[in-house]
Amino acid sequence: MLKVWEPQAFLEFLNRRRTEFYPEIEAQVRAILERVRREGDGALYAFTRQFDGADLEATGLRVTEAEYREAEAAVSAAFRAALQVAVENIAAFHRPQVPTSWFTTRPDGTIVGQRVTPVDRAGVYVPGGSAPLFSCLLMTAIPAVVAGVPEVIVCTPPDRNGRIDPHMLVAARAAGVKDVYKVGGAQAIGAMAYGTATVPRVDKIAGPGNYYVTLAKKLVFGPVGIDMLAGPTEVMAVDDGSVDAEWLAADLLSQAEHPNGMVILVTTAGPERIAAVGAAMARHTAALPRAETIRRSVAELGAALAVDTLEEAADLVNAVGPEHLEVGVADPWAFLPLVRHAGSIFLGRWTPEAMGDYIAGPSNVIPTEGTARYASPVCVETFIKRSAVTCYSEAAFRAQAPHAVRLALTEDLLAHAASMQIRLAKPDGESPSEGREAG
């Protein structure tokens, strides 16, 4: 079921795929964003009719309290219990990430430091489609709440009846979300970036989406911050034959059931192992309701690569920079130091990637398409910023300002130099008010 690649040929294929441009899609996204910027809610209603088949003008874009109450009554006690475990684990993982402001005084009396503050309002995008991805909501909104963001909102597309899945709404309340808006696609990104009469403008947008959503995030960046450019999902499994082939096959299929999901197997156990895992994938697929999506994903983006050593496997991992990395080897902790580029790493046979999707604690909103080379999963840091703080005493200023003046003059920035020279011209200990009176 998996296409066998020669490693270098696969890396070349991957690089071509990751560097493709889609100017026709960019033109469509730009047009959507511009219409949202100009027309606000009117554009959102029109696009929701066009793309989601829902007419919301009578009921509005914002989820009402009545809808939250209906959702609470609709979900099972078992779901509530599982949700609570997930919420607790996600919050517990992210709390230690919260940084503190700090200040230090140098020997000359200068005080320097950093003041850490959250953004005022965060916008979370949750994809729609055939499944209610409330896990993405939890994994994005909870880090924002833990970071201290005063207001977190969510945009997600409605169904054809103009409703949001009740599990999504219950998850939103459990995560601490203020409001949910029935808006999806690139138009949702535009609404959160520019603001409309209903959807407030946010300071940071986070969450995954399809190519249209990802491109919209890229285009609005600047006036609003974004977490990353997170595209279709990926999983890469490093294997030495020590994990049951049936288990490994099931793990790979867990990502293939997403449209355009990429699955990569790197094994040191030879062609027979690839055949065994592929056969197991075929058997599992036949019994799954999303079999058609899985077969398409695997046919287009499934790959198996045979290597001789785990060191070679690690080189491939670092070249790919996968979103999800499963390390199914006899000693996963010995392999871990070899990994430099991977979004989220799952060690050992009892750690299927799907545990990370729902309940382990780290966010499942993770860099894709090789961006793990420089980017990180959504976390508390996504929603905070640092302000540098500096305070000179007079003595410290007089000691160091001449050096700063020399540097400013060397850059030929005379006004910079003058702002320091005007202070140096004052007699020691004379306040500005004393100087004015003397003049």
UniProtKB/Swiss-Prot annotation:
Protein residues bound to Zn(2+): 255, 258, 357, 416
One Gene Ontology cellular component: cytosol
Entry EC no(s): 1.1.1.23
Top EC class of this enzyme: oxidoreductase
Pathway: Amino-acid biosynthesis; L-histidine biosynthesis; L-histidine from 5-phospho-alpha-D-ribose 1-diphosphate: step 9/9
Cofactor: how bound: Binds 1 zinc ion per subunit.
Reactions it catalyzes: L-histidinol + 2 NAD(+) + H2O = L-histidine + 2 NADH + 3 H(+)
Active site, per annotation: 323-324
The protein's required cofactors: Zn(2+)
An example Gene Ontology molecular-function term: NAD binding
GO biological process terms held by the UniProt record: L-histidine biosynthetic process
Annotated positions binding substrate: 233, 255, 258, 324, 357, 411, 416
Xref: CDD domains: Histidinol_dh
Record-linked InterPro entries: Ald_DH/histidinol_DH (IPR016161), Histidinol_DH_CS (IPR001692), Histidinol_DH_monofunct (IPR022695), Hstdl_DH (IPR012131)
Positions of NAD(+) binding: 125, 187, 210
Keyword field: Amino-acid biosynthesis, Histidine biosynthesis, Metal-binding, NAD, Oxidoreductase, Zinc
Stated family: Belongs to the histidinol dehydrogenase family.
Function, in words: Catalyzes the sequential NAD-dependent oxidations of L-histidinol to L-histidinaldehyde and then to L-histidine.
NCBIfam families linked: hisD
HAMAP family referenced in this protein's UniProt entry, alphabetically: HisD (MF_01024)
Stated name of the protein: Histidinol dehydrogenase
